[in-house]
Curated annotation (Swiss-Prot):
Matching SUPFAM superfamilies: Thiolase-like (SSF53901)
Residues of the active site: 170, 311, 347
GN (gene name): fabF
A single BP term in Gene Ontology: fatty acid biosynthetic process
Organism of provenance: Rhizobium meliloti (strain 1021)
Name recorded for this polypeptide: 3-oxoacyl-[acyl-carrier-protein] synthase 2
Family stated for the protein in its record: Belongs to the thiolase-like superfamily. Beta-ketoacyl-ACP synthases family.
């Protein structure tokens, strides 16, 4: 099958607008968790989140007007705006602007979201109740449908190849990249714009995830300490928002136009737990099989893995994932670094896997493992380096990125340094 590489990245994250800004702040140990002030939270169990830094567009802040006209913004949910911004960045970074029929038809889009326009749906419900059906906007449906993130990107950039979307909870971003890679490998496209996007931070979302016992509620007075994967004092994840988009390209297509290459996508695994609607299987079997499949597809062994970007949500599932990883890597555990970047940016739900895949590609590029913040008191002993507190310089040629979601849906991506052959 054809080989697939990453030639462009774009990101809107709680650490900033832009891949390099977010990456630099991640490596220096910045933490995006804050008390929510944009709406009332005093009656909510979870009062904190990792919000995008909004501003005038300078110093890494996000200004939606830079990416979409205000009139158009009012027609869509923010998750679509974030996707548009990240896709614009990724395509510009890749230097890919298809203009011929051939190039447009061979370029597709696959962008997913875990929740989509949740707040917009709630608001429309109030409008219907209080003002009647005639006050519902004609843009209500197309502004909230999850596949419209891909649709809007496709329309803006005239990308006429596969136009697809996935919805697999917190595995969405990883599944989008994995599925898009397969479309290229199978010859259905030469280039794919792929990733995940999410704008979930609103009252009903915080209330709902807290009701599932998924969110941190014990660190409302000290938000930066709330997301603490693998730590004994963890009590749930901190919700985040944003988008991560990559440009995936068939290797020879990228080489022919002299594109820079971040990494090669060599493995993709997916599995189901068939266990519980929110909890992972306690033996980690689904996660293990998912990673094992990715290794098989990649044609590498566990001993080849240098860095793992863990799903690591700061929940009870952390130790289950760690156990599955230890089972996978066996005697190679002591040479592997594994960190959870959710400790800095929170859990971006459907965007998480895509943002973390980008971080994994950058870890390969720069030979550095980003840190796991707040790992003060590890809950279990392991030979794996969990990269506590401070980023670690080390050789990284192969990286594994894990994403696991509600409903027992699992995805693993394996990236490798591209060396020119």
């Amino acid at each position: 099958m054809r080989r697939v590489v990453i030639t462009g990245t774009g990101m809107v994250s709680p650490l900033g607008c832009g891949t390099e800004v977010s990456w630099a702040r991640l490596l220096t140990g910045d933490n995006a968790a804050r008390k929510v002030t944009e709406f009332e939270v005093e009656d909510l169990p979870a009062k904190i989140a990792c919000r995008i830094p909004f501003g005038d567009g300078s110093d890494g802040t996000f200004n939606a007007d830079d990416w979409m006209e205000p009139k158009e913004q009012r027609k869509v949910d923010p998750f679509i705006v974030y996707a548009m911004a990240a896709a614009d960045m990724a395509l510009a970074d890749a230097g890919w602007k298809p203009e011929s029929d051939e190039d447009q038809i061979s370029t597709g889009v696959l962008i997913g979201s875990g929740i989509g326009g949740l707040e917009g749906i709630v608001d429309a419900g109030y409008t219907l109740r209080d003002k009647g059906p005639r006050r519902i906007s004609p843009f209500f449906i197309p502004g909230r449908l999850i596949n419209l993130a891909a649709g809007q990107v496709s329309i803006r950039h005239k990308l006429r190849g596969p136009n697809h979307s996935v919805v697999t909870a917190c595995s969405t971003g990883a599944h989008a990249i994995g599925d898009a890679s397969r479309l290229i490998a199978l010859g259905d496209a030469d280039v794919m714009v792929a990733g995940g996007t999410e704008s979930p931070i609103c009252r009903i979302s915080l209330a709902g995830f807290a009701a599932c016992k998924a969110l941190s509620t014990q660190h409302n007075d000290n938000p930066e300490k709330a997301s603490r994967p693998y730590d004994a004092d963890r009590d749930g994840f901190v919700m985040g928002e944003g988008a991560g988009i990559v440009v995936l390209e068939e290797l020879e297509h990228a080489r022919a136009r002299g594109a820079k290459i971040y990494a090669e996508v060599i493995g993709y695994g997916l599995s189901g737990d068939a266990f519980h609607i929110t909890a992972p299987s306690e033996d980690g079997e689904g996660a293990y099989r998912c990673m094992q499949m990715a290794l098989k597809r990649a044609g590498v062994t566990a001993a080849d893995i240098d860095y793992i970007n863990a799903h690591g949500t700061s929940t009870m599932a952390d130790t289950i994932e760690l156990g599955a990883v230890e089972r996978l890597v066996g005697d190679s555990a002591s040479r592997i670094s594994m960190s959870s970047t959710k400790s800095a940016i929170g859990h971006l739900l459907g965007a998480a896997g895509a943002v973390e895949a980008i971080f994994s590609a950058l870890a390969i590029r720069d030979n550095i493992a980003p840190p796991t913040l707040n790992l003060d008191n590890p809950s279990v002993e392991t030979k794996i380096d969990l990269v506590p507190h401070v980023a670690r310089k080390r050789e990284i040629n192969v990286a594994l990125s894990n994403s696991f979601g509600f409903g027992g849906t699992n995805a693993s991506l394996i990236l490798r340094r591209y060396t020119g052959h």
